[in-house]
Structures are given as C-alpha cells and as structure tokens.
C-alpha cells in the first residue's frame, strides 16, 4: 500500500507553524507497517490543493490531507476536494448535526460562519471530530481514497487513531505490522555510529536501521516488519543488544526513555540525592531534572551563581581562587561542587562553569570553554571541554554532558 500526505496552509509555507501533523501521521502509519511514500505542502489556494490531490491520487492508494477545514474565507479544502473529484459542494446534514450538538455541549450559540464547515463534497463520508467543530471526511478519487482532517494537532490526533487508521488498515486488508525500538546515543557522531553499525541490518533479515540527529544526541531507530508479534520483539531486542555491545556507554537511553528520564530512574533506584551549582547554563540543568515528575524525592537544590560574588557567598568559593584561576577553571568548578554538596547535604553535587558566548572568550579560554565537576563522599573530580556552536548549542550540550556525568556516576553506584 502506498500512502501520501498533503499538508495545507499558508502558515506552513511561510514558516510560521511547524508541520507536526505529518510527522505524527507518518509515525502512526509506520507502526502498522505502512510507509509514507510522499509528502506535499501547499498553501490555502483552491487550485493548488485540487491539483495536488489529483497528482497524489494517481500514484497512491491513500492520501491523507490536513488543514483548511475551518470557518474562515481561507479555508478552501472542501471546495478543492469537490473540484478534484468532480462533485458538488452540498450541506452535509450529518456534519451540521454534530456541529450543533458541539455548541450545545459548550453552552454557547453557534456563529453562522461555522456553518461553512458543513459544506462538503456530495456523498462524502464523515470522520467524526469529538473535540472540535470541523468534521473530517473521506471519498474516492479513481482508485485512491482521499481523507481530510482538520489542521489542529490535538483534534487531528484523536481522529487519526479513532477513525483514519482503522479505515486504512481495512483498505489494506492484511495484518503486517512494523515495530520500532529507539536507542539514544550521546558522544558519537552520526558517521561514527553508522560505521560501527554498518552491517547490522544486513546480518539480520527483516531489521532496518535509521538515524535521526536531535542535537546533541542521535536516535538509533531499529525497525522490524512482519506478522508475528513475538518474532518482531525478538528481532528488535537482538538488534538492540548488538547496538549496546558496539556503542557501549554511549547509549544513554533505552526505548521510551530520554537521558533525563534515565537519570531520574537511576536516582530512584539508587536512593541517592543531588544538588547543582550552575553558572553558564543558568539553571538549564535544574530545569531538565525538575521536568521529570517525582524529582523532589532526590533533588535538593540548585544554586545559579552567575557572578563571582555569588559563587563566593553562596558556595564558599575562595575569592583568592577566583582571582588566581578565573571563574572558568577546573579548580573553581570543583569548589562550586563541594560548596553545593555542603550547602544541600546531598550525596552528589554537580557544578558547571564556562563561557557560552558570544562574548567573554580569550585566547586561553575561547568561547565554548566549559568545566564540569562532580563531588561525592569520596572526593571531587573535574574535566574541561571545548564545545562549538552558538550560545544555545553550547548551553545545550553542556547540560546534556552534565546529565551524562550523573548517569555514569549512578550506574557505578
């Protein structure tokens, strides 16, 4: 089965809105072993939409379109669908009934403009929308099934799962499934990972490997397709074991996890506690830690000590040390970590200090110079890094590197 996606909206072409709908639809179809062969994006132009529908219908079994089903003048998808299929645009009484019921539930009066959303191609079948005003619909164009969904992501997602996917599976008529297992890798480039895993899919028929860079990590996606659920699971687990063997400690998160949730799980399992002292990251690491529910069980405090005086007053970093080595140094990072641990009474304390830029660098300590330190009962260690990129990238990779320090320390507990 060949499927295609059509995203509709001027806001997509202008870069004002990111098209998350297509990604969600493609991923959901892939879970069922259906690969999206093509994707187009067009603006709110009736002729462009109709032309795209006709073009995609010629080479695909199913086309799923999103957007342009609202009540305003620029919502022209239904008219374009009628034009492409040679049908009249008529008032769909079933859609109107759903719309009236929706406003009754809200306790609000329906604006006359909303009635435009019920003008659909003749004999179109409805796709119910339980959370919004725009009904979806589907109809054939030659041998292709055209399906239309609203562009609001939350509405689209419900309609996709409840109606669209079952219809597509019914049309396919077979029961092959695709299962995906994702491992998160940090500290290796995509090229290095690919070289280490180059023979993985060739040595295991039915298994494919794909890579997705989400700076500063790389997602290694293992996919297996077949009819036997048990065989798919076994194939994926075998592939994942080999990835872990070849990439070692660079695999920082398993399927369904991130490096942040992995660290959270390890804190819960070990019963250890944490304090942070941040300078160049300005609380970014603490934000990642506290974004995970339940972090209050192990996270005590974070001191964002941007100024030297704050490092001295809050963390006890000696003024003489700051003057001698500068705030960006291994010695100061270690003093910050020890001070945070003493302040909080935690098992672990991690500190970062660095130059995120774009200003503040020097020949000896250019922009991107970062020191990370970790203190525990046994002592304190520190390491220097030189990260490249703009301010946001430097801060991001510093935070992820810090999370990896915590992950590795907790694994050694």
Swiss-Prot record:
Pfam families given in the database record: CinA, CinA_KH, MoCF_biosynth
NCBIfam families, sorted: cinA_nterm, molyb_syn, PncC_domain, PRK00549.1
Family statement: Belongs to the CinA family.
Protein name, as recorded: CinA-like protein
Natural source organism: Geobacter metallireducens (strain ATCC 53774 / DSM 7210 / GS-15)
Origin organism lineage: Bacteria, Pseudomonadati, Thermodesulfobacteriota, Desulfuromonadia, Geobacterales
């Amino acid at each position: 089965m060949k499927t295609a996606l059509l995203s509709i909206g001027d806001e997509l072409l202008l870069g004002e809105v990111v098209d998350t709908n297509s990604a969600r639809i493609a991923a959901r179809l892939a879970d069922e072993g259906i690969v999206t062969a093509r994707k187009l994006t067009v603006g709110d132009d009736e002729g462009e939409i109709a032309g795209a529908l006709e073009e995609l219908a010629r080479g695909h079994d199913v086309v799923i379109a999103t957007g342009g089903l609202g009540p305003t003048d620029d919502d022209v998808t239904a008219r374009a669908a009628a034009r492409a299929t040679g049908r009249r645009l008529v008032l769909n009484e079933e859609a109107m009934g759903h719309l009236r019921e929706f406003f009754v539930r809200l306790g609000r009066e329906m604006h006359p403009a909303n009635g435009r959303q019920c003008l659909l191609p003749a004999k179109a079948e409805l796709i119910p929308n339980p959370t919004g005003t725009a009904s979806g619909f589907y109809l054939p164009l030659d041998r292709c099934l055209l399906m239309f969904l609203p562009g609001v992501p939350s509405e689209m997602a419900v309609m996709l799962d409840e109606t669209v996917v079952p219809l597509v599976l019914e049309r396919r008529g077979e029961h092959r499934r695709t299962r995906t297992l994702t491992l998160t890798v940090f500290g290796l480039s995509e090229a290095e990972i690919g070289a280490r895993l180059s023979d993985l899919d060739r040595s295991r028929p039915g298994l494919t490997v794909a890579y997705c860079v989400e700076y500063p990590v790389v997602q290694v996606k293992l996919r297996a397709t077949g009819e036997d659920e048990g065989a798919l699971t076994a194939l994926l687990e075998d592939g994942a074991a080999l990835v872990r063997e070849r990439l070692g400690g660079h695999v920082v998160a398993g399927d369904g996890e991130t490096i942040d949730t992995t660290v959270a799980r390890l804190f819960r399992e070990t019963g250890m506690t944490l304090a942070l002292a941040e300078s160049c990251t300005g609380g970014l690491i603490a934000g990642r830690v506290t974004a995970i529910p339940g972090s209050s069980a192990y996270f005590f405090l974070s001191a964002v000590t941007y100024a030297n005086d704050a490092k001295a007053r809050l963390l006890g970093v000696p003024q003489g040390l700051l003057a001698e080595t500068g705030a960006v140094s291994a010695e100061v990072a270690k003093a910050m970590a020890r001070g945070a641990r003493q302040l909080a009474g935690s098992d672990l304390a991690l500190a970062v200090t660095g130059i995120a830029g774009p200003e503040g660098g020097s020949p000896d300590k250019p922009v991107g110079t970062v020191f990370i330190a970790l203190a525990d009962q046994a002592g304190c260690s520190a390491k220097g890094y030189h990260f490249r990129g703009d301010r946001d990238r430097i801060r991001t990779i510093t935070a992820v590197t810090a999370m990896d320090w915590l992950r590795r320390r907790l694994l050694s507990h």
